[in-house]
Design a protein with these regions (language model features):
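Extreme N-terminal starter segment of soluble prokaryotic enzymes
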Residues: 1-4
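Active-site environment of divalent metal-dependent phosphoester hydrolases
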Residues: 10-14, 52-55, 82-94, 122, ...
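Short, conserved loop/helix-junction motifs that constitute active-site signature segments
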Residues: 73-76, 146-149, 178-183, 262-264, ...
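Conserved beta-sheet core of the metallophosphoesterase superfamily
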Residues: 167-233
Length: 357
């Protein structure tokens, strides 16, 4: 049996941006559901954070969520299992009140949809899989006990595990220890949007780009085979963020007249100016770029020739925002718990980068 695994869909991201809803819809209409149809996949498991806002949902977002996700699952007769993530709950100390419970209980197709705010071992065609929702202070002991008691060798969850990258180049320095998952052959998790693997634990990553931190970081969904235990990655070809290097040295103006800018429509574009020797050519380039109707264009003069460095080198040489904040906290003189302050700052930062101003 093959299961489609998807996680961190964050319906309503960037302050319920219509542009991002359109971007999400394109992925579902042209990539996700066509793949399920072609391969006859009738079971989908969502590993948490199906919505973005913790305390409410915008009516426009809800309408699009139902039309492009729920009803598409329903008309295909797909069995849908969703694990509650931290963005699906309004409170930090309980999962009992959650978006899935409130939304799915009012939908006629709810008999084909199962949501899990408590741990549960589910059998998928002979393969036991432990489904683990977000772990908080109140359910920590019960969650650990459920992991120890489950006969499953495979675990799907929404975990915050120490040592994994939250986004590319930004490592999480707190959370669950990896050794508590040692009894499982395989653990697949949502929560961190960067796709990564260490040992028996794999973060699946989000299906699409939502911030500049996601730039050039592969996004998509996965297919898990319950018989072979193999995982296949299906990449999303559509991107929201682009970097364009401008260098008109040795180029004729005619080249800029022939350039195709259509791929930048409804996306964010960062133009890195390496060499600008012909002002007319540069203006022509920008005019044609703006005619493609991007959401936003930012222009950066490249004094350090960043285009000649791999992205990995740029990330390693530059301190990310969270590292700067963490160092600031460590140098402060105060009586409080610095670890808790770091967590608070990280949460505030994550909220900020997901807002559409």
């Amino acid at each position: 049996m093959k299961l489609a695994l998807i996680t961190d869909t964050h319906w309503g991201v960037r302050n319920d941006s219509i542009t991002f809803l359109d971007y999400f819809t394109k992925f579902y209409r042209e990539v996700f559901f066509p793949y399920l149809d072609k391969h006859g996949i009738d079971t989908v498991v969502h590993l948490g954070d199906i919505v973005d806002r913790r305390k409410f949902i915008n009516y426009v977002t809800l309408n699009r969520f139902k039309d492009e996700w729920i009803f598409e699952l329903e008309k295909r007769g797909i069995d849908f299992h969703v694990i509650v993530g931290n963005h699906d709950v309004p409170y930090r100390n309980t999962n009992e009140i959650n978006a899935m419970k409130e939304l799915f209980s009012t939908i006629d197709a709810s008999e084909k949809m199962s949501y899990y705010y408590e741990p549960k071992t589910v059998n998928f065609d002979g393969c036991d899989i432990l489904l683990m929702p977000w772990i908080n202070n109140a359910n920590y002991k019960d969650s650990i006990q459920a992991m120890n008691d489950s006969p499953a060798q495979v675990c799907f969850g929404h975990f915050e595990i120490e040592g994994f990258e939250m986004m590319r180049g930004v490592k999480n320095d707190h959370g669950l220890k990896t050794d508590i998952f040692s009894q499982f052959d395989t653990v697949y998790s949502g929560h961190f949007h960067h796709k990564s693997t260490r040992g028996n634990i794999t973060y699946l990553g989000s299906p699409y780009e939502m911030t500049w931190s996601d730039y050039n970081d592969p996004r998509g969904f996965h297919i898990f085979d319950t018989d072979t235990r193999e995982l296949e990655f299906i990449q999303n070809p559509y991107r929201m963020f682009h970097k364009v290097v401008y260098n008109d040295e040795g180029k004729a103006v005619e080249e800029y007249k022939k350039m195709d800018f259509e791929m930048y429509r409804d996306t964010y574009v960062k133009v890195i100016v390496q060499n600008k020797t012909n002002p007319y050519a540069f203006d022509l380039f920008l005019d044609n770029l703006y005619k493609s109707d991007p959401i936003n264009v930012s222009i950066v003069d490249d004094n350090k020739h960043l285009d000649k460095q791999p992205d990995e080198e740029i990330f390693s040489e530059a301190e990310d925002t969270m590292t700067i904040l963490s160092k600031y906290v460590s140098n402060m003189e105060f009586q409080g718990d610095s670890a808790k302050l770091n967590v608070l700052l990280r949460d505030l930062y994550q909220e900020a980068v997901h807002l559409e101003l």
